[in-house]
Amino acid sequence: MDLQKRIDNYHNTFPKFPKTLYLSDECILGMWVMGNNYTTKTDLYGAYPYGYLKRIHALFPLIPNKTLHLFSGSLPDSEDYDKVDFNTGFDAETFSEIIPHNTYELILADPPYSIEDCDHYGCCMIKRNIVFKQAYNVLKSGGHLIWLDQVLPNYKKIEFKIIARIGMVKSTNHRFRVITIFEKN
């Protein structure tokens, strides 16, 4: 699906939302205000905001058996996707040593943003560049890495190109984040 069709699918899926996504220089740009809906069905600190995955999947549909969730703490187990998280027995900085390379077409990542966040999770801060290399190894050529973070991680332009940048905020007193979507070259 080309990028404009992804945008159109998003706007058709959410017709009441403002049309805040657009295409510029072969890159989806936009802003999402998620709102103050606190019905996320988990007590886990830092879980995806309510509606986040529905919005993402309107742009990049779940690919059964070809989707990986990194830092997947609150997601239920499913036969449709695999998970890497400190509570699954896979380490985010070494998982490509176990998972076969060129396996996934879609990877969604929501890493801890800071040392303070890691204190809440009970884990250590990750090295984003190492996790990126691990994701590169298991992602198929042409596959997509959707990275939700407060920073743009270091990446190699010979390995990835950015195809989307979407700012995201929940509501007042919440951090701004950015959804950066990479395509593996």
Language-model-detected regions and their locations in the chain:
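Class I S-adenosyl-L-methionine-dependent methyltransferase catalytic core
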Residues: 1-185
